[in-house]
Amino acid sequence: MRKLVVGSRRSKLALTQSQQFIDKLKAVEPNLEIEIKEIVTKGDRIVDKQLSKVGGKGLFVKEIQHELFEKNIDMAIHSLKDVPSVIPEGLTLGCIPDRELPFDAYISKTHTPLSQLPEGSIIGTSSLRRGAQILSKYPNLEIKWIRGNIDTRLEKLQTEDYDAIILAAAGLRRMGWSDDIVTSYLDRDTLLPAIGQGALGIECRSDDEELLTLLSKVHNDEVAKCVTAERTFLAEMDGSCQVPIAGYATISDQKEIEFTGLIMTPDGKERFEYTMNGTDPVELGKTVSNKLKEQGAYEIIKRLNEQH
């Protein structure tokens, strides 16, 4: 096998999860020589604006995909939730490895449970999806925008006027944070995860047969089916960063895929949700999308997209 060059964002989390995946590859092919090339994306450069307001689709992947096309790198290790639902022609997701915990972590300054926060308490999040679902269940709380890496957000929780923050559990775990800092992990009924949350997507050139053969050794087929249902739903709903959209699939004991899709308004007042089981992940994602469109969810998407 030739020496491989992996493209990664420069953030501490991106580099850490890239190294963790490289370690997984080396466990099956110990003699691999792999180098990480750090790439700064548009999303990394925007630190003072809410990403949903600057056209969030692909903000963290486009520059990396360009490096793949130019053959400056052989593969890219993405957080799958950052990857648009349509992959450019000539590239492919060569592997979906094991999924980290897909839920969100709620961290309170005073370790107060979410359901017991006083009226007017301020929750920090950078996600319309999280904000909408919290306001839907707890309309007496206030959502305040927060950006920055994990360390920055934890510091802002202590030094600024946030009573709690919500972060992806996967990032905390990959960075080695102890469960002790988490007040609670929010289950799917409280906060349905983002499409692909907790999963990695390993992107490479479609014609790189040698690399695709290697990647197949660390591919998790069950996780791939789940995220395919989720990403099909995202593509069918034409969900942009202006739309609070969530979707989560699991494999049942009967080996069926159970998928829940959710569309909301940012204020949490309108909510469209549907759950069903199936065996074909693409058909399942499409069917749940159609069910939500029948309920009127697509009108929300059109309205929100027109506002931006």
From Swiss-Prot:
Residues bearing S-(dipyrrolylmethanemethyl)cysteine are 241
* Role summary: Tetrapolymerization of the monopyrrole PBG into the hydroxymethylbilane pre-uroporphyrinogen in several discrete steps.
Q: Which GO terms describe its cellular component?
A: cytoplasm
This one is known as: Porphobilinogen deaminase
Q: Keywords on this record?
A: Porphyrin biosynthesis, Transferase
Q: Which PROSITE patterns match?
A: PORPHOBILINOGEN_DEAM (PS00533)
Q: To which protein family does this belong?
A: Belongs to the HMBS family.
Single Gene Ontology BP term? Answer: protoporphyrinogen IX biosynthetic process
Instruction: Identify the NCBIfam families for this entry.
Output: hemC
State its Enzyme Commission number(s): 2.5.1.61
> Does the record carry Transferase as a key word?
yes
Gene Ontology molecular function, alphabetical: hydroxymethylbilane synthase activity
The primary gene name is hemC
